[in-house]
């Protein structure tokens, strides 16, 4: 299923020097976002920086949202993870997409202009409405919390 999403190019290098975000394979869930920097940027250990992607999206459909997620190799190989763990893009947001990068590693890491640094995934949204109750119906789990089911 394909859903049209409005895309605004904020950096003229997108679509010329660097491709528009796209799915790499028919089974891809995310589209890569690129570091649209003016110069290469070295992120020191422990440092967090905000990186422009050069695009904005308007999802428009309230039954959808977008999330910015890490690329697996960045965190595993280089210690570069998202500073906010997941970026949530509400359907009515129209501003620039930025990626918060945190170097949790022990070595400086240099992002180069146009590097793929995160991925954009569109997800369904259910807006819940709370129903106030005094007690919950009994469930098998009940109030069992962290670690209650063990590890084996």
Curated annotation (Swiss-Prot):
Obligatory cofactor(s): Mg(2+)
One GO-annotated biological process of the protein: dUMP biosynthetic process
Pathway: Pyrimidine metabolism; dUMP biosynthesis; dUMP from dCTP (dUTP route): step 2/2
Binding site for substrate: 71-73, 84, 88-90, 98
Superkingdom field: Bacteria
Keywords for this protein: Hydrolase, Magnesium, Metal-binding, Nucleotide metabolism
Record-level Gene Ontology MF annotations: dUTP diphosphatase activity; magnesium ion binding
Catalytic activity, as annotated: dUTP + H2O = dUMP + diphosphate + H(+)
EC number: 3.6.1.23
Alphabetized Gene3D superfamilies for the sequence: 2.70.40.10
UniProt-listed HAMAP family: dUTPase_bact (MF_00116)
Family per similarity comment: Belongs to the dUTPase family.
PANTHER family: DEOXYURIDINE 5'-TRIPHOSPHATE NUCLEOTIDOHYDROLASE (PTHR11241:SF0)
Protein name stated in the entry: Deoxyuridine 5'-triphosphate nucleotidohydrolase
Organism whose genome encodes this protein: Shewanella amazonensis (strain ATCC BAA-1098 / SB2B)
Lineage of origin: Bacteria, Pseudomonadati, Pseudomonadota, Gammaproteobacteria, Alteromonadales
Name of the coding gene: dut
